[in-house]
Amino acid sequence: MGSLSTLNLIKTCVTLASSEKLNQPSQCYTISTCMKSSNNPPFNYYQINGRKKMSTAIDSSVNAPPEQKYNSTALEHDTEIIEIEDHIECIRRLLRTAGDGRISVSPYDTAWIALIKDLDGHDSPQFPSSMEWVADNQLPDGSWGDEHFVCVYDRLVNTIACVVALRSWNVHAHKCEKGIKYIKENVHKLEDANEEHMTCGFEVVFPALLQRAQSMGIKGIPYNAPVIEEIYNSREKKLKRIPMEVVHKVATSLLFSLEGLENLEWEKLLKLQSPDGSFLTSPSSTAFAFIHTKDRKCFNFINNIVHTFKGGAPHTYPVDIFGRLWAVDRLQRLGISRFFESEIAEFLSHVHRFWSDEAGVFSGRESVFCDIDDTSMGLRLLRMHGYHVDPNVLKNFKQSDKFSCYGGQMMECSSPIYNLYRASQLQFPGEEILEEANKFAYKFLQEKLESNQILDKWLISNHLSDEIKVGLEMPWYATLPRVETSYYIHHYGGGDDVWIGKTLYRMPEISNDTYRELARLDFRRCQAQHQLEWIYMQRWYESCRMQEFGISRKEVLRAYFLASGTIFEVERAKERVAWARSQIISHMIKSFFNKETTSSDQKQALLTELLFGNISASETEKRELDGVVVATLRQFLEGFDIGTRHQVKAAWDVWLRKVEQGEAHGGADAELCTTTLNTCANQHLSSHPDYNTLSKLTNKICHKLSQIQHQKEMKGGIKAKCSINNKEVDIEMQWLVKLVLEKSGLNRKAKQAFLSIAKTYYYRAYYADQTMDAHIFKVLFEPVV
């Protein structure tokens, strides 16, 4: 093969980067380009891995590639490594000081707090710092709201609230006039605004503020504009959906917008107050309640917020559950969660303390109201980390055959249903509610995509539709961690993401540019290590004469990709390469046995030598193919230390016996691979009863998936449809997921190896070759920018 540097390879294939369709890679892209030998190191090898000479690295690692230690002294002065360490430390500080959650200030809620009169009877605000915050944070155009993103709903509801607060105390008249002018000149924009981006409760609270402004004699606002009449009509429709007798008895979403309601019976409503004194964690709703009731718990809640935010108030608080769940989700999907294992464990322990199998969770702890978004995310992450949670909690959000974020919602949107879909994929056997949720969510999201109606009610993100599209095309069983990360790094909005509540808001623990930058740096670092290992794999391929066994370079690349797409960490090079090589060596042996020219005597002689011979170094001198097999396996085993080598050799002996008996199918290969992985990771647990149960189930699943893959290949695997329609396999996968995720006496990492192997078999059976080739390029060769 000719020489081609990785840098040139990237330039050749870079047009694929613009193709987001999983099943339609760029026309100029061919996987064979990526398989050409490279005598040059990866483009950033010296930046990432110190300045070791390439020839030395290759020569010393044909059998066991060197691990590029994260904390190696040789890397201390490397710019990217220092940057990675700085980002990790910055994020650790952020996570360790999460408290009740970080969230931006809402002018609207701050204005409502500023309306509270002095408790001692003076004609002044009880919280002058809130009044000062309002006065100090008007934008140059006269409005209040998110400085960097213009949403007319957000700007208008914030501005009318701040104008009312300023006029109530007869201060800053010029600021009032600028605000009134902004409302007058921009209220017509509501006619063409995206309804999906309407702030929460806008149709309830905006008319109420207009009425208050009009009763105060504030002139210049077009109170009778047609668009305002439409908003009043929307208000009436919403209030009819949730009758007032229900509002006074049950915790509904209207508790979040009490300031927009009339004729309230406060004695009844105070019974629905949250333990922290708030009404559904809303400062504005709670401020309105305090104005009418002088309830001490309401006051304490407001006082704490004003102190915490130095006069300001967010639209909701606390956000400890929401912030923790979404932070963990982002860190996991960005592929950087391994740097923050203790912080993630603490986050999920906190969430679990406030989880209810009867109700679920809300954005803030101890809420009397829950929603499907937080509950779905909590269900998925808690289950994934070994906590017992009951998915039947989702029945609270199901009416007839539909799921909704919460009762009374007028318009269902994409992001909560997408989180429901993701949670539904961690189904255990017999969990019908998750089966129903999966079918509903997939259909709902597919229809949204097809009709291009993916704008969301809760999140403004440039790549949300792409994220959902990829999520539907990549079911969890068939998703490799590095493939998911390669897409999500592009889809993740970082600090540009804007959340929609009563006003627009930002969440630093969720939408964070430092997360994204660390993910990019880490991905590049891992990718450079993988590219280096691929060079070793190609040298190994040639030196072991694999082409003579009918094994193509493409097959070796795919085997290595499955390993590196799952075990991607730089420090796990030994496990990753052992996985890939064990798959190829087993293929070599089966290829030798399946050759028509191989006699029975030759087969038996090779088996005897592999099983009982010493497999000494002198065998490398043999020129026949059986000698190559012996030498290759010897070389592989010598890459392990003596104790580990004994364990791996025992696994190979078991597999070779199955070859002898004609039972070396996909399940046997999976067992060999899993044992090798766990042995490399010093997980010597094969005598544990749970280990044997997992092994048998994984073997069974992988055998069936191998048959499905073979059938698809016979029908034309290159462009075959990406799907698996086998109910039996799916049920067995549910059992495997249950055994792996539920806590037991078996080490979690050892159990995870079984699921990882099974998912690679599912991946191969699910995707067409063309799609797999696109993933290979994206994970191993496409630059991350």
UniProtKB/Swiss-Prot annotation:
GO CC field: chloroplast
Annotated compartments: Plastid, Chloroplast
Reaction equations catalysed: (2E,6E,10E)-geranylgeranyl diphosphate = (+)-copalyl diphosphate
SUPFAM superfamilies: Terpenoid cyclases/Protein prenyltransferases (SSF48239), Terpenoid synthases (SSF48576)
GO molecular function: copalyl diphosphate synthase activity; magnesium ion binding; terpene synthase activity
GO process annotations (BP): gibberellin biosynthetic process
First and last residue of the signal peptide: none
Tissues where the protein occurs: Present in both leaves and flowers, with higher levels in leaves.
Broad EC category: isomerase
Annotated positions binding substrate: K238, K457
Keywords: Chloroplast, Isomerase, Magnesium, Metal-binding, Plastid, Transit peptide
EC number: 5.5.1.12
Positions that bind Mg(2+): D371, D373
Keyword Plastid on entry: yes
Cofactor(s) of this protein: Mg(2+)
Keyword Cell membrane: no
Annotated motif DXDD motif, positions: 371-374
Pathway annotation: Secondary metabolite biosynthesis; terpenoid biosynthesis
One Pfam family hit: Terpene_synth
Source superkingdom: Eukaryota
Family: Belongs to the terpene synthase family.
Recorded domain comment: The Asp-Xaa-Asp-Asp (DXDD) motif is important for the catalytic activity, presumably through binding to Mg(2+).
Task of the protein: Involved in the biosynthesis of labdane-type diterpenoid including marrubiin and other labdane-related furanoid diterpenoids with potential applications as anti-diabetics, analgesics or vasorelaxants. Terpene synthase that produces (+)-copalyl diphosphate ((+)-CPP) from geranylgeranyl diphosphate (GGPP).
PANTHER family linked: COPAL-8-OL DIPHOSPHATE HYDRATASE, CHLOROPLASTIC (PTHR31739:SF30), ENT-COPALYL DIPHOSPHATE SYNTHASE, CHLOROPLASTIC (PTHR31739)
Protein name: (+)-copalyl diphosphate synthase 3, chloroplastic
